[in-house]
From Swiss-Prot:
Cofactor(s) it depends on: FMN
TM stretches of this protein: none
Main location: membrane
GO CC, alphabetical: cytoplasm; plasma membrane
Broad class of enzyme this protein falls into: oxidoreductase
Free-text function comment from the UniProt entry: Catalyzes the conversion of dihydroorotate to orotate with quinone as electron acceptor.
UniProt name for this protein: Dihydroorotate dehydrogenase (quinone)
CDD domains, per the entry: DHOD_2_like
Organism: Rhodopseudomonas palustris (strain HaA2)
Length: 364
């Protein structure tokens, strides 16, 4: 079914504006038959953040911003889905065009600006599917016009705690002016303290929902030192490494798009984000697991992220170029690697290459 969907949809979607194609893809997923997914190889199961993931391959925030198709995505074989970014109030985001394909680089530039339906609408959808099971995380952010951005995060934690499998505190999008300033030490410490306090306030009624922090790949190593130290001291449950980058590699072939503002994702982000995974893994010293994201487009790329220090991985941009069949392909490659090397689980290789990667010259 997935192969047929890809064969039909990928050529068609390439003919459309990138954002229109994305909208059509979400609508198409909602129309797919409710086919029960094949069981995953038990060796791919991952225990992280107090949750049991059937496999390590998730879909990153940004694809299903408004929780319109989480169950369809789970049925397609993802081990978990992250919806959002959600803000307290609905917002339109930045003016179009704001999403651009770099086809020769298998990359995307976006400056979406947290366009979403707002907390009330997204909560209603998640509450309606609450009995469906599966791990569905909620990525939360601040409204562009907010006068108290920390209060936005706190309100979202309190609102979504009953329906979120986990939270991702997104302070790393480059498309909301000033948002990345929340990664600075004093601001981040205050934010995480208040977010964790909010989680504790609703613990009795909503449970102990894990809180993850998503960071930018553009941090310096000194800044990363501070971020990881604060994350550990505030006892966050994990980190997602990393968001899109503002950097533009001179190796990019799609030169006509180099001046487009926004975050770059896809294959050109792979090396930088993998280095950041390894650097974060070394600094975390086992305090919490990591989700690796950025440029994963094959089983080999997923394995590299895991060996750099990621317990789980997320995809998005590669799906635009390779289709939804990529999910099963990555899982099959990971299972084959475990079988070939005689290992019982992916946890045995998490971070195996981190010392080697971090010894390389910086910046990459």
């Amino acid at each position: 079914m997935i192969r047929a969907f890809d064969a039909f949809s990928l050529p068609l979607l390439r003919l459309l504006d990138a954002e229109d194609a994305h909208r059509l893809a979400i609508q198409g997923l909602r129309l797919l038959p409710q086919v029960k997914p094949r069981p995953d190889d038990s060796k791919l199961a991952v225990r992280a953040f107090g949750l049991n993931f059937p496999n390590p391959v998730g879909i990153a925030a940004g694809f299903d911003k408004n929780a319109e198709a989480p169950d369809a995505l789970l049925r397609l074989g993802f081990g978990f889905v992250e919806i959002g970014t959600v803000t307290p109030k609905p917002q339109a985001g930045n003016p179009r065009p704001r999403l651009f394909r770099l086809e020769r680089d298998e990359a995307i530039i976006n400056r979406m600006g947290f366009n979403n339906d707002g907390a009330e609408a997204v909560l209603r959808r998640l509450a309606a599917r609450a009995q469906q099971g599966g791990i569905v995380g909620v990525n939360v952010g601040a409204n562009k016009d907010s006068t108290d951005r920390v209060a936005d995060y706190v309100s979202l934690i309190e609102t979504f705690a009953p329906v979120a499998s986990y939270f991702t505190v997104n302070v790393s999008s480059p498309n909301t002016p000033g948002l990345r300033n929340l990664q600075q030490a004093a601001a981040l410490d205050d934010l995480l303290a208040r977010v964790i306090e909010a989680r504790e306030r609703v613990r009795a009624s909503a449970g102990d929902t894990p809180v993850l922090l998503k960071i930018a790949p553009d941090l310096t190593l000194s800044e990363l030192d501070d971020v990881v130290h604060i994350a550990r001291s505030r006892r966050v449950d994990g980190m997602i490494v990393a968001n899109t980058t503002l950097s533009r590699s001179p190796m990019l072939r799609e030169r006509t798009r180099l001046n487009e503002q926004g975050g770059l994702s896809g294959r050109p982000l792979f090396r930088l984000s993998t280095r950041m995974v390894a650097e974060t893994y070394v600094r975390a010293e086992g305090a919490f697991p990591l989700i690796g994201v950025g440029g994963i487009d094959s089983g080999g790329a997923a394995l590299t992220k895991i060996r750099a220090g990621a317990s789980l991985v997320q995809l998005y941009s590669a799906l635009i170029y390779k289709g939804l069949g990529l999910v099963d392909s990555i899982k099959a490659d990971l299972a084959s690697t475990l079988l070939r090397t005689g290992r019982d689980s992916l946890s045995e290789i998490v971070g195996a290459d981190a010392p080697t990667i971090t010894a390389e010259e910086w910046p990459v």
